[in-house]
A protein has these predicted regions:
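Structured loop/turn residues at beta-strand edges in well-structured enzyme cores
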Residues: 73, 91, 119, 152-155
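Hydrophobic residues at beta-strand termini and immediately following loops
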Residues: 34, 127, 160
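N-terminal beta1-alpha1-beta2 submodule of the flavodoxin-like/Rossmannoid cofactor-binding fold
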Residues: 1-98, 102, 181-195
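Conserved nucleotide-sugar donor-interacting segment of glycosyltransferase catalytic cores
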Residues: 102-112
Length: 195
């Protein structure tokens, strides 16, 4: 099994990353680590979009511009780790999504105009933490879930969150341990599937 770990955290002492490491360290698999803060993934602009469209129209996917999309499409499981910022996630993750969402690699349009997901992965795990309360799961996690299921063809989406971490009087360690318990259930599911 090959896991793609997409890290959209930027703080070295990230609590989101702590939960992710807890999970990742307990799933035996080949792991590709992608720290988005170390990558130079920029928002799509007209020049890049036109270049990419020329390549995809010609079905020329050998250009290095597509390596993020190929890694994503070929992973067996994807773990996305992002703090809850501004009702969703950091811009780093949105830039990455624009880079991977390539027609012909991650998805395709059928003759009827419907979307057909091309990803090998059957599982995506989304991990987030918030200093306050997560107002709605729809904006961050919900967006990732819809994109993964409807566009990428990934069936099983798991969600681990720890919220209220910066609220005065919060029992931070207990909140994080509860998130790790959710991770334990996912680990058990993976171990059962792979035995």
């Amino acid at each position: 099994m090959k896991i793609l770990y997409v890290n959209a955290t930027v703080r070295p002492d990230s609590r989101t990353k702590r939960i992710a490491r807890y999970l990742l360290d307990r799933i035996p698999a080949e792991k590709k680590i992608l720290n988005l803060g170390d990558e130079d993934i920029r928002p799509l602009n007209n020049e890049v979009l036109e270049f990419r469209t020329r390549l995809t129209s010609a079905k020329d996917f050998e250009n290095g511009i597509f390596h993020y999309a190929k890694d994503y499409a070929q992973a067996d499981t994807i773990i996305i780790v992002a703090p809850y910022w501004d009702l969703s996630f950091p811009a780093l993750l949105k830039n990455y999504i624009e880079a991977i969402n390539v027609n012909g690699i991650v998805f395709r349009y059928t003759d009827k105009g419907e979307v057909d997901g091309l990803c090998k992965a059957k599982n995506l795990i989304y991990i987030t933490t918030a200093g306050g309360k997560i107002i709605s799961d729809d904006y961050g996690f919900g967006y990732i879930k819809e994109l993964a299921q409807k566009f990428h063809g990934i069936e099983n989406i798991e969600y681990i969150k720890a919220e209220g971490l910066d609220i005065e009087g919060a029992e931070v360690e207990k909140i994080l341990q509860n998130a790790e318990k959710k991770a334990d259930k996912i680990i058990e599911m993976f171990n059962n599937k792979n035995n």
